[in-house]
Every structure is written in structure tokens, then in C-alpha cells.
Regions:
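Hydrophobic transmembrane alpha-helices and their immediate loop junctions
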Residues: 1-151
Length: 151
């Protein structure tokens, strides 16, 4: 049921770190640009994965296919238009994942259509970046608290 594939795990680590880091960074960047400086004050306005990755959540993703990152804390009362801005901050993470997924997809497409010589490891990592980002975007838009789609 919970198959464990060591090769998939190794190829997936960069994809998961990229997906989680950019997802949470997008929330932080959106919040700050909309007037809430809480993420900046908490050190979350960075692409340093250590600010965004919860080690236990990352391990759980591999072991049971369900995990988490450190959520970006925001204070909606700091927003200019709290209801609208809260939604925009929530959508920023999945939107970033979709963008990264499309970029990875087009890199894969370019490699395949132009017969670019890349190692199987590099190709596998790019594939996992695509898979994890698209899955994160879809999953996070489910209307279930605390996911982004519940806002």
C-alpha cells in the first residue's frame, strides 16, 4: 500500500524541496506585497529551504505519501483588503507550484524534442519537479482546512 522506492526517494528530494520552498516563499512574498510584514519579521521571505521545510513533514511525505511544510504565518488585519488579500496569499502558493510545474514540463518537452543529452538522473529529477509541483498545486486547492483552498 505504501510502497517505498529508494531511487524515487533520491530523485524526489530536490523536487520536494523546490516545491515546498517556492510554495511557502510565494505565500510570504504575496503577504508582504499586500501589506503584512509578518513573514518578513519571521524570516520567511527567503528561498532558503531551512526556513520552510519541516524535516518530519518531509520524511512523512516519503514514508506515507502525506507530509507538510512550515506554514507561513500571516496577520490578515494588516492587509489593505483583508478578505481579498487573504485569498490572494492563499492562491500564491499553488500558483507558484503550477508555474514551476509548467517550467519543468517545458524543459522535459525541450529535452525530448531536441534530443538533448542529459543524464537519466537529471531527467528523473526534472520529472519529479514536474510531478510534485503539479500535485502540490492540485492538493493544496482542496477546500479542506488548513489547505490553501479552504480560504
Amino acid at each position: 500500500m505504501f510502497g517505498f522506492n529508494f531511487e524515487e526517494m533520491l530523485l524526489g528530494i530536490p523536487g520536494l524541496i523546490i516545491a515546498m520552498t517556492f510554495h511557502e516563499y510565494a505565500h510570504a512574498r504575496a503577504a508582504v506585497s499586500l501589506g503584512d510584514f509578518t513573514p518578513r519579521l519571521m524570516g520567511r521571505l527567503t528561498l532558503d529551504p531551512r526556513a520552510h521545510i519541516d524535516p518530519i513533514g518531509l520524511i512523512m511525505l516519503f514514508l506515507v505519501r502525506f507530509g507538510w511544510a512550515k506554514p507561513v504565518m500571516v496577520n490578515p488585519s494588516n492587509f489593505r483588503q483583508p478578505k481579498r488579500d487573504d485569498i490572494l496569499v492563499s492562491v500564491a502558493g499553488p500558483a507558484m507550484n503550477l508555474l514551476l510545474g509548467f517550467i519543468a514540463f517545458y524543459i522535459i518537452l525541450f529535452i525530448r524534442t531536441h534530443n538533448v543529452d542529459v543524464s537519466s538522473i537529471t531527467y528523473g529529477i526534472i520529472q519529479m519537479i514536474f510531478v510534485y509541483n503539479v500535485n502540490f498545486a492540485i492538493f493544496n486547492m482542496l477546500p479542506i482546512p488548513p489547505l490553501d483552498g479552504s480560504h
